[in-house]
Amino acid sequence: MIVDLEASSAEDAVALKEKITDKLHNFIVAENYEAIFSISIGVIDAATFCEGTEECRKKFEFALKQAKSMGKNGFYVFDQDDYEVFLQKGRIVAALRNAVVNHYDGFEVYYQPIVDCQTEQIIGAEALMRFSMITEEGREFVSPMEFIPLLEETGLIIPAGRYILNEAAAMCCEMQKYIPDFRMNVNVSYVQILQGNVERDILDAIQKYALKPECLCVEMTESGFMDMTPSFCKFRKSLEKNGISFVIDDFGTGYSNLHCIRDMNPSYVKMDRDFTAKAMNSDRDYELYKNIIPMVHSINVRICAEGIEEKEWLLKMKEMKVDYLQGYYFGRPCGKKQFLQQYASGINVK
């Protein structure tokens, strides 16, 4: 329902909402109905934000949608900045859909080296999804923080994830010409597990490129499987059965704990980059970081420290006997061609 109200402020709209609520309540009581209801209200100053009926309708629908997203009896006053964010999300989703149906044009895989902490030699890489969309100014890179949640919301992460997985497997095969035991880490989303058949996708990629199963490592953040235990356990058992490595990403954030490591039995855990940075700049965090390492090692799980940016940090990680390292000190994520040029030799990365 749309109400055209002459009002001097949003408070007038709130007052109207209360009147409507009271009227409905009194009617229900008087007629002896049994009903539970709530009223969500979106408010827009049409004189300020609308130039025509169609624009007003679209912006009002947005305001009402925002109000409903706040829960029962939600109330939202139109904000132009929020609306611009909403429109940008719509543009990104449209671009993602278009890319998927056009042979993944706009998607690209970047690779960041993972090195052995003691020898400083490259032993693998993490495959990272990147996306750019066409705008009036040309190609515009979209932050993974923006487009990956949208891929998950729309289900497009299933075909896009399959594409990235195959590209990463092909790159692993290429790198093994130079580094025989090279391993590739690929991120998997909870949506791929719940709605797709990612186990089959992984096995198909391994078979297609004749990879040893242990050379393909599946990464997931703990938040990705906290709320889907049955589905995740089935997925985890499938990985174990087929000899595919499993890695817990971003350890040290959110719900991450040692019980998780014990129950999930990963090949190794990746210490979150922010956790690493704090440990390098705070004695208290350093002691915590240092004491976690032997506990994790005691249950036969290795550790990769993310976010290594300085030589001093590298030396501290050596002292703490961390197994693997990843970070800008060894190399920023880059495309396939650049990665091959820089790291195919297999020598020390620095």
What are these regions (language model features)?
Residues 1-90:
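Cyclic-dinucleotide signaling modules
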Residues 4, 134-137, 189-196, 215-230, ...:
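EAL-family c-di-GMP phosphodiesterase catalytic domain
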Residues 16, 20, 24, 56-63, ...:
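Structural preference for long, well-ordered alpha-helical segments in enzyme cores
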Residues 35-40, 107, 125, 182-184, ...:
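PAS and PAS-like sensory/regulatory domains
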Residues 47, 62-108, 118, 150-157, ...:
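C-di-GMP signaling machinery
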Residues 88-150, 187, 248, 305, ...:
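Active-site core of bacterial EAL-family cyclic-dinucleotide phosphodiesterase domains
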